[in-house]
Amino acid sequence: MTIVEINHLQVTFAEKTAVSAAGFSVNAGETFSLIGESGCGKSTILRVIAGLQRDWHGQVSLFGHTIKPGMRFQGDLRRNVQMVFQDPYASLHPNHTLWRTLAEPLKIRGEREIEKRVQTALEQVGLPFDTARRYPHQLSGGQRQRVVIARALLLRPQLLLLDEPTSALDMSVQAEILNLLNQLKLEHQMTYLLVSHDADVIAHMSDRAALMSEGKIQRFFDRDAMEKGEHRMD
């Protein structure tokens, strides 16, 4: 099953073209990655798929449903597409306890057994339940990113968008988070779309990848090509 299909995607900011004629598909259960230097357009594509960037041209479908420019994600679509951002501290409200941050999306959807769901999500990312009583500044960078991943898991998404999920973390923590993501993907049968400029991260996580430069996809790589290092930009 094709989870994401993009054809001729174009995104322009003022007079600058951020994404030009991009096209690719992502199959259920795989990790597909976009690799490229900062500013090449890969995160913009992620924001289109997440419904955060609503001004674009082209064809985009998610789970077989056509997505239109300006469309607001609601219902199952909003639940099934979740995003983990680059900086975990910036994506957590500094004045809210982690309990409020984690419980709020469940309350909005009228979910039941909220405390149990939050506890399970924290345990799945290796954090004790009493972490929920704390504030973001009381956690390490790696712990904050685990909380962000837990928040994404709470709604049980089918597609997880990962925007440089380890680039703001110390090297010693990066491998832990990447291994956690791989483990969770298998346990929850999710599909990942990963953005990174790090060739090692791409090789560790990906089934397939695409190299971007100046808003365009230049080349695709399968697993064999990545094992040979053909995806490296240097």
Named regions from a protein language model:
Residues 4, 19-21:
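Conserved structural motif at the start of ABC-family nucleotide-binding domains
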Residues 35-37:
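The feature captures the beta-strand-to-loop junction immediately N-terminal to the Walker
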Residues 50:
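Helix-to-loop junction immediately C-terminal to a conserved catalytic motif
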Residues 66-82, 96, 100, 108, ...:
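ABC ATPase NBD coupling module
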Residues 115-130:
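Conserved ABC ATPase "signature" region
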Residues 135-139, 143:
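Conserved ABC ATPase signature
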Residues 154-158:
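A short, proline-enriched helix->beta-strand linker immediately N-terminal to the Walker B motif
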